[in-house]
Amino acid sequence: MTKPNGSGDSKNTLYCSFCGKSQHEVKKLIAGPTVFICDECVELCMDIIREENKTSAIKSRDGVPTPQEICDVLDDYVIGQRYAKRILSVAVHNHYKRLSHAGKTDGVELSKSNILLVGPTGCGKTLLAQTLARILDVPFTMADATTLTEAGYVGEDVENIVLKLLQSADYNVERAQRGIVYIDEIDKISRKSDNPSITRDVSGEGVQQALLKIMEGTVAAVPPQGGRKHPQQEFLQVDTTNILFICGGAFAGLEKIIAARGENASIGFGATIKSGEERGVGDTLREVEPEDLQKFGLIPEFIGRLPVLATLEDLDEKALIQILTQPKNALLKQYQRLFDMESVQLTFTPEALVAVARRAITRKTGARGLRSIMESILLDTMFELPNLRGVEEVVINAEVVDGNAEPLYVHASKSQTEAG
């Protein structure tokens, strides 16, 4: 768009159709069929869209997402685990309600209920937390318990968790104080010995002790630049009273402690193994009691800070097939998209999907092992495919998954190839 008035130079000058600035006043001018838009207007549009996305987060009539709404979104990405989803949905819903109730002076103070997720590896604990992060309108951060140590030792301080939450809230202290923290691999900070006085356990019991206060509620002094490297910086004061903590861990071996308690067996090899085979890890974990967690290595005070306990189930063959095919970000859909980019259709037969699920069960890696299995099956095909001509479909059957056959390449007919 040019403006007709002015000197000869101005006739050739282009202007933004929205704000009217010339090409010399802005960094870039993007041309459409009959209009132009400058980089500043594009940025403004993006800001407007971002704000609209924030305000369009799931809300019920009183501004609090209902447990059903939260659970429905979790269902889009996480297969199974109905019991754990319901517990998480109610806990997050109540967290929102506590925040909206905070200013009311009716004498009733609502305390938070932190959550402990217990389940076998690859059953969806971390994915549940990541999916929650997508749908919540409060700051959310994930931390790895294995990197934490007591203050004064090499490693991360527990205050770094609050710092990460503060960063996810763009250093808005008030928003960070209403956030949710997920601490993964919490079972890795169990006490290393039944006798706490033998030696100082800086990455086990020491971390549990350090987490107690921030989980219950304290004013944490958080260094904005990350702590030990900048000792002279000013500290930000963050009140953790209203921060919801969700902890998750596989707790490998906990099922044996539960089984031994249930059968009153101090040694009894056969009985415990038989119980495990008949019921599976997930079924056994459902009977977990605080005393079992204490025997595993969590201190009683730490267990007391996690009043809500949710156990996750083992993923069976049917659930693993659903994980491969059904969610919005299903693994099979991802690989099919990669093959689409080469104009090739990728097809897994129903028998092949069953074989993939069985391999994952044999490996005992749960859903986490599915990607490595798929990668090993399709590696050679993905290597060769860009150099092949006329291939329109690749078919994977059970024999291919088991390593007894090569993938089937379906070529376009001669007439189609010539037409192409």
Swiss-Prot record:
InterPro entries registered for this protein in UniProt? AAA+_ATPase (IPR003593), ATP-dep_Clp_protease_ClpX (IPR050052), ATPase_AAA_core (IPR003959), Clp_ATPase_C (IPR019489), Clp_protease_ATP-bd_su_ClpX (IPR004487), ClpX_bact (IPR046425), P-loop_NTPase (IPR027417), Znf_CppX_C4 (IPR010603)
Q: Which GO terms describe its molecular function?
A: ATP binding; ATP hydrolysis activity; ATP-dependent protein folding chaperone; protein dimerization activity; unfolded protein binding; zinc ion binding
In this chain, ATP is annotated as bound at: P120, T121, G122, C123, G124, K125, T126, L127
An annotated GO cellular component of this protein is: HslUV protease complex
**Domain ClpX-type ZB intervals:** 4-57
The UniProt annotation places Zn(2+) binding at C16, C19, C38, C41
Question: Which keywords fit this entry according to its UniProt record?
Answer: ATP-binding, Chaperone, Metal-binding, Nucleotide-binding, Zinc
**Pfam families xref list:** AAA_2, ClpB_D2-small, zf-C4_ClpX
Q: List the GO biological process terms.
A: cell division; proteolysis involved in protein catabolic process
What Gene3D superfamilies does the record tag this protein with?
1.10.8.60, ClpX chaperone, C4-type zinc finger domain, P-loop containing nucleotide triphosphate hydrolases
Family of this protein: Belongs to the ClpX chaperone family.
Task: Describe its function.
Answer: ATP-dependent specificity component of the Clp protease. It directs the protease to specific substrates. Can perform chaperone functions in the absence of ClpP.
Q: Which PANTHER family match?
A: ATP-DEPENDENT CLP PROTEASE ATP-BINDING SUBUNIT CLPX-LIKE, MITOCHONDRIAL, ATP-DEPENDENT CLP PROTEASE ATP-BINDING SUBUNIT CLPX-LIKE, MITOCHONDRIAL-RELATED
Q: How does it assemble?
A: Component of the ClpX-ClpP complex. Forms a hexameric ring that, in the presence of ATP, binds to fourteen ClpP subunits assembled into a disk-like structure with a central cavity, resembling the structure of eukaryotic proteasomes.
The protein depicted here goes by the name ATP-dependent Clp protease ATP-binding subunit ClpX
| Organism annotation | Hyphomonas neptunium (strain ATCC 15444)
Taxonomic classification, please? Bacteria, Pseudomonadati, Pseudomonadota, Alphaproteobacteria, Hyphomonadales
